[in-house]
């Protein structure tokens, strides 16, 4: 029996911070694999989201704020190996940050689909068409589509636009895969999300969450030890809070979300440590 052709390719999701890249990839994959927040630059690493629909495998990459990074970093390597770029813009707003991102991605001459996100927040819909015309001239995309990632408006339509551009390639990942990230990574992302939620503007800009151990002990319960690394003692005090109320809230909220994600009871210990300079 003749083997049917398979189609597979990487699709880079780019845009300035806070345009909804992480929300979009979560809605496409229909699973929260990338953290979302109103705080800028919440995505610190390239997040891979995989969606396999029969013969077609779409590998979406949620890139962190690429316009600030070195062109030799992983984000740009991913973009160069992509077959398509989803360039996300925020409603009818065009700023210097958008211009910087556009100039970076145009160098690679990879086809661009322009995605106008958050259209649910536009009250006067008559301003959308003039902005589409502006973007057509500015970006010269192969397609342009208004969506609301948060409301799932036009998400399926966007996916349908991508189909024709997938090249004839064998699938890279097994059918059931939705991301390449480990359990440790997923847990660390949940903890980081809670840090952002509870601390907001007080959150240190450079912060690392490391999962030190995951052990399954009696009664089928996971014991997880995590460490939050900060640069200064002052930052440590901010996270812990008065009478340890801050870290308590973060720990409880993290535990509940982790249990929901893995469908298993856990015991979570979170330490806050000052990173020793080498």
Curated annotation (Swiss-Prot):
Q: Which family does it belong to?
A: Belongs to the TRAFAC class TrmE-Era-EngA-EngB-Septin-like GTPase superfamily. Era GTPase family.
HAMAP family xref list: GTPase_Era
Residues binding GTP: 15-22, 62-66, 117-120
- The segments labelled G3 in the record are 62-65
A single Gene Ontology biological process assigned to it is: ribosomal small subunit assembly
Bilayer disposition of the protein: Peripheral membrane protein
In the record, what terms sit under GO molecular function? GTP binding; GTPase activity; ribosomal small subunit binding; small ribosomal subunit rRNA binding
Question: Subunit structure of this entry?
Answer: Monomer.
* Functional summary from the UniProt entry: An essential GTPase that binds both GDP and GTP, with rapid nucleotide exchange. Plays a role in 16S rRNA processing and 30S ribosomal subunit biogenesis and possibly also in cell cycle regulation and energy metabolism.
Q: Locate the region G5.
A: 147-149
Q: What is this protein called?
A: GTPase Era
């Amino acid at each position: 029996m003749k083997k049917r052709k398979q189609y597979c390719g990487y699709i880079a999701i780019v845009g300035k911070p806070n345009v909804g890249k992480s929300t979009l990839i979560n809605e496409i994959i229909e699973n929260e694999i990338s953290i979302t927040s109103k705080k800028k630059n919440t995505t610190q690493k390239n997040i891979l989201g995989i969606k396999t629909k029969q013969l077609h495998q779409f590998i979406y990459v949620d890139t962190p704020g690429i316009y600030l990074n070195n062109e030799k970093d992983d984000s740009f390597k991913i973009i160069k190996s992509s077959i398509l770029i989803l360039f996300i813009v925020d409603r009818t707003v065009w700023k210097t940050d958008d211009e910087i991102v556009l100039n970076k991605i145009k160098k690679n001459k990879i086809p661009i689909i322009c995605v106008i996100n958050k259209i649910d927040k536009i009250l006067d819909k008559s301003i959308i068409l003039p902005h589409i015309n502006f973007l057509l001239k500015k970006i010269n995309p192969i397609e342009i589509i208004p969506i609301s990632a948060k409301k799932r408006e036009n998400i399926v339509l966007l996916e349908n636009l991508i189909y024709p551009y997938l090249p004839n390639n064998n699938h890279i990942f097994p059918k059931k895969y939705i991301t390449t990230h480990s359990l440790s990574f997923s847990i660390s992302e949940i903890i980081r999300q809670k840090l952002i939620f509870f601390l907001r503007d007080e959150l240190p800009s450079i912060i690392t969450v490391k999962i030190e151990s995951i052990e399954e002990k009696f009664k089928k319960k996971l014991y997880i030890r995590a460490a939050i690394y900060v640069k200064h003692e002052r930052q440590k005090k901010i996270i812990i809070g008065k009478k340890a109320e801050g870290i308590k809230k973060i720990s409880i909220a993290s535990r509940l979300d982790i249990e929901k994600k893995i469908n298993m009871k856990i015991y979570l210990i979170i330490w806050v440590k000052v990173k020793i300079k080498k």
